[in-house]
Amino acid sequence: MPLSYPHFRKLLLLDDEAGPLEEELPRLADEDLNRRVAADLNLQLPNVSIPWTHKVGNFTGLYSSTVPAFNPNWSTPSFPDIHLHQDLISKCEQFVGPLTKNELRRLKLVMPARFYPKVTKYFPMDKGIKPYYPEHAVNHYFKTRHYLHTLWKAGILYKRESTRSASFCGSPYSWEQELQHGSTSLNDTKRHGTESLCAQSSGILSRPSAGSAIQSKFQQSRLGLQHKQGQLANGKQGRSGRLRSRVHTPTRWPAGVEPSSTRCVNNLASRSASCFHQSAVREKANPSLSTSKRHTSTGNAVELNPVPPSSVGSQGKGSVLPCWWLQFRDTEPCSDYCLSHIINLLEDWGPCYEHGQHYIRTPRTPARVTGGVFLVDKNPHNTTESRLVVDFSQFSRGTTRVSWPKFAVPNLQSLTNLLSSNLSWLSLDVSAAFYHLPLHPAAMPHLLVGSSGLSRYVARLSSTSRIHDHQHGTLQNLHNSCTRNLYVSLLLLFQTLGRKLHLYSHPIILGFRKIPMGVGLSPFLLAQFTSAICSVVRRAFPHCLAFSYMDDLVLGAKSVQHLESLYTAVTNFLLSVGIHLNTSKTKRWGYSLHFMGYVIGSWGSLPQDHIVHKIKECFRKLPVNRPIDWKVCQRIVGLLGFAAPFTQCGYPALMPLYACITAKQAFVFSPTYKAFLCKQYMNLYPVARQRPGLCQVFADATPTGWGLAIGHQRMRGTFVAPLPIHTAELLAACFARSRSGATLIGTDNSVVLSRKYTSFPWLLGCAANWILRGTSFVYVPSALNPADDPSRGRLGLYRPLLRLPFQPTTGRTSLYADSPSVPSHLPDRVHFASPLHVAWRPP
């Protein structure tokens, strides 16, 4: 007869009418009983041939491809001028006095952040924008390019100008200047007799007014300015002021550098119309565009070969090809859907390329990408805005993967001990938190994103027009890309993007100037940064509480008025160091703080309502007697595991599911097991704050017996059969709790102390979790444990009770500014005879 739910509940001692604990509890450790119950509840892993279920409610499992939804009306979020001040440390010291070593160490980690992986794979530019939405390929291309352009304009990305130079917008940092003044740039050029630079003394090369002067030295490639490979680079001039023929000569002149003034004057003649086929109307209409000639360049049909500008020297050559976009202007329309109709809508399509306000030298940066990008909804609640997903997963894969640094995540009990109080709370929203932290320019070549331009992108998508190397720029294949879909998409995009369509149709390579979200280093750096800032705030306002996890900052104060003044002071401080807060998203919580998915009040912690609702939905849709794919089980366990500490039996109740996931097998929910879990999660108990106190109750055990010391009273008992030592110690702790009702128990067993009951026999783990719920444990060495003698059968000997105070831990929540001293690698005394591994012998 199958085990019914009431019987099962009785077996787990969850009912009040259970027999004496000392008799009932050891039975649950019996392996045979555990095996029979598991078989009865169908918890044995099924090796049946019934097809697995791959979807339960919203949880999808193996072989399922969730098709992401593309929104043609996505708006690109705006990024404020985020610039974390470089004198952050001195500003913090003005605010709070000298910083602690811990705070200094953390702040120095991000000023600037560094990222140098062992191996970086470079992918072709075609892989830059992922073809995530094949139905909306062109729309997705332009929206992604617009997002990247927005990030570049906000100073979050560098734009690769040539192999060894990049430009960016926004305020420069000193380390970006240092790259210019190193021994390899100015000092070398002087040593080799080359001309001095007409650059600003700051070392960052701001854009010169006579923009085109540089273009006699540099020719425009599909990715920006590069040196001409003609006579200038052949080295025959020696030291006569020309460039020397060294391997790295082209890097000596980053884009944006002007040669000496005479050269500048001579080269002014090379200025001409910005794009090959743009008419003179544009210069008359907008003279500023023609003066900043370096905004522009000519391209070619598929933009693969470097193409010189239409300068005086190159016009005579006759073989220069215009940019792919503007080339349509001089061709006959091939159909009603020819792109030339769109190109002829505007006389002035603007520049082919834009350049930043500042230039820096970079390490050698190939015209490749190291990760792909695509767009998704900003979050499940906001589908109107897009979010850029950057896939730098190459750094987390294979033998050369980077092992990311570990950092402390506060556990539930520590969080409750710290934040469960009668304070008033509010939480701050840091806008684009990751993009606050600057990255050293030397890391740029490892974090490259970009695109190969619209012509390549379209050619990849259409099967008819393949790009062959010998076909570059030939008019036969120019119109191959004219399709109805492309025409309609571009026409719609023209209404929102206007002449930027031209700019975005060119190829581009961008490297990260601030830390990107797709790299495992970023969460670590953000956590270090925000915890250091909170530490500074806590020391400045010792009567208040500031705490952070990643970009989630919370402030607590005794009263609402006090909290408001604290909020004003902290906001002003954060703004003064360059941290951007989204004040419209500040949330005032009253006395119940919503943080990290929990509601934390003076009564303790509970999961937030939306999580409880998800759990109810999950049980409603959970099928019984049907094999469920282990990947779905993984997702179910992820949800249930979050709320497990609030249930009677905790994590041990989920152990059968964990076992099936580990074995990668299907799992069948029996009606009894489902009813058991359902009941567990329908009644959630708060996790309470631990209180300090003095330990008066001690427990100890040997494999054959147990002993308790409750105040001055001693008790002992024996087990029917010898048990593993950890199981015996756990039973002794349960007896101590049930006999004394004490919430503070002293034990010498590290496994009981850890409160992880998942490695015990399943039924015992479930029951012990409920009995010991809300119990705090204090470690007492065996030699000093008053319960040691009773456990060995000696009741006559009385060891004096220890004064063993218990202080609740706030765990590794990085709360205190003073970091504990780091222990040396070897402890003072090494115990080789570990009690966990040495078989117990009777005294």
Curated annotation (Swiss-Prot):
Disulfide bonds: none
Protein name: Protein P
Note: Hepadnaviral virions contain probably just one P protein molecule per particle.
Start and end residues of each stretch annotated as Terminal protein domain (TP): 1-177
GO biological process: DNA replication; symbiont-mediated suppression of host innate immune response
UniProt entry keywords in alphabetical sequence: DNA replication, DNA-binding, DNA-directed DNA polymerase, Endonuclease, Host-virus interaction, Hydrolase, Inhibition of host innate immune response by virus, Inhibition of host RLR pathway by virus, Magnesium, Metal-binding, Multifunctional enzyme, Nuclease, Nucleotidyltransferase, RNA-directed DNA polymerase, Transferase, Viral immunoevasion
Inhibition and activation profile: Activated by host HSP70 and HSP40 in vitro to be able to bind the epsilon loop of the pgRNA. Because deletion of the RNase H region renders the protein partly chaperone-independent, the chaperones may be needed indirectly to relieve occlusion of the RNA-binding site by this domain. Inhibited by several reverse-transcriptase inhibitors: Lamivudine, Adefovir and Entecavir.
One of the record's GO molecular function terms: DNA-directed DNA polymerase activity
Ranges for region Spacer: 178-346
Region (Disordered): 228-259, 283-314
Presence of keyword Metal-binding: yes
Organism domain of life: Viruses
Record-marked site positions (Priming of reverse-transcription by covalently linking the first nucleotide of the (-)DNA): Y63
PANTHER family in the record: PEPTIDASE A2 DOMAIN-CONTAINING PROTEIN-RELATED, POL PROTEIN
InterPro entries: DNA/RNA_pol_sf (IPR043502), DNApol_viral_C (IPR001462), DNApol_viral_N (IPR000201), HBV_DPOL (IPR037531), Rev_trsase/Diguanyl_cyclase (IPR043128), RT_dom (IPR000477), Viral_Replic_Matur_Polypro (IPR051320)
EC numbers on record: 2.7.7.7, 2.7.7.49, 3.1.26.4
Positions contributing to Mg(2+) binding: D429, D551, D552
Species annotation: Hepatitis B virus genotype F2 (isolate Brazil/w4B)
Catalytic activity: DNA(n) + a 2'-deoxyribonucleoside 5'-triphosphate = DNA(n+1) + diphosphate; Endonucleolytic cleavage to 5'-phosphomonoester
A Pfam family of this chain: RVT_1
Regions of compositional bias (Basic residues) in chain numbering: 239-249
Domain Reverse transcriptase positions: 357-600
Region (Polymerase/reverse transcriptase domain (RT)): 347-690
Gene3D superfamilies assigned: 3.30.70.270
